[in-house]
């Protein structure tokens, strides 16, 4: 942790509401005239979308599984090193994972690819992370140890899955079958790597659904 170069992380699952929480932080930064360097959790994925599809097929053929919640599909070491480097020097690198055509076209790329790594802006007052693994701990890596303020957006599973289904189908062009396969395939990693983070957070938020979420596989509008 660093007093000169603090790290703030908002962590939660896909569809949990981390984007809404992050928007609130950005408004706070603006009101306090703080300049934040931002890194996205998706930028630490190991694979492009075609590479991930191939990795999923290989894992399935060998009776194993791989998901974006687990270490096989993410570079926890690089994430940890990013937090360490920023805490020491206020420097680091970032890139983006391009989910949609709208995101990809300005880069002259296709969805499911990464932008090149680029230096973080300087100088900045804080590093802000939003993603799946801001508080992850494994036998090899302790990302949570390097975060000064760790905020969790904890699971409300049915609401979370409905929002993920709606977003991935309407905004990212995935089929219902592909989204539900992703949810089912991710369960072991979800339990082992995502949910333990919420015992390490400094603050947790938990949303309360105000719509019918009884059928978690039903696409419906539930807000952001």
Indicate where each model-derived feature is located:
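Conserved lysine of the Walker
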Residues: 18
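C-terminal accessory "lid"/substrate-recognition subdomains
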Residues: 113-122, 126-129, 143-145, 157-224
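Post-Walker A alpha-helix
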Residues: 21-22, 26
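Short hydrophobic/aromatic beta-strand immediately N-terminal to the Walker A/P-loop
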Residues: 8-11
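Conserved ATPase-coupling elements of RecA-like P-loop NTPase cores
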Residues: 136-141
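Conserved nucleotide-sensing/catalytic segment adjacent to the nucleotide-binding pocket
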Residues: 34-40, 44-105
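Phosphate-binding P-loop
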Residues: 1-5
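The conserved Walker
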Residues: 14
């Amino acid at each position: 942790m660093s007093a000169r170069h603090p790290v703030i992380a908002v962590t939660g699952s896909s569809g949990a509401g981390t984007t809404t929480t992050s928007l609130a932080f950005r408004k706070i930064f603006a009101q306090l005239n703080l300049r934040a360097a931002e890194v996205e959790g998706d930028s630490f994925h190991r694979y492009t979308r075609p590479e991930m599809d191939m990795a999923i097929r290989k894992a399935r053929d060998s009776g194993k599984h791989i998901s974006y919640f687990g270490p096989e599909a993410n570079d926890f070491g690089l994430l940890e090193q990013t937090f360490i480097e920023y805490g020491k020097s206020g420097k680091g690198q970032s890139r983006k994972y391009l989910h949609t055509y709208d995101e990809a076209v300005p880069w002259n790329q296709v969805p499911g690819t990464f932008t090149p790594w680029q230096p973080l802006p300087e100088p900045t007052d804080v590093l802000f992370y939003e993603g799946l693994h801001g508080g992850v701990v494994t036998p090899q890596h302790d990302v949570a140890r390097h975060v000064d303020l760790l905020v969790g957006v904890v699971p409300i599973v049915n609401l979370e899955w409905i929002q993920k289904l709606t977003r991935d189908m309407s905004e990212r062009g995935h089929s219902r079958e592909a989204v539900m396969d992703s949810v089912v395939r991710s369960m072991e990693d979800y339990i082992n790597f995502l949910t333990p983070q919420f015992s390490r957070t400094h603050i947790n938020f938990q949303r309360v659904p105000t719509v019918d979420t009884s059928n978690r596989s039903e696409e419906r509008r539930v807000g952001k």
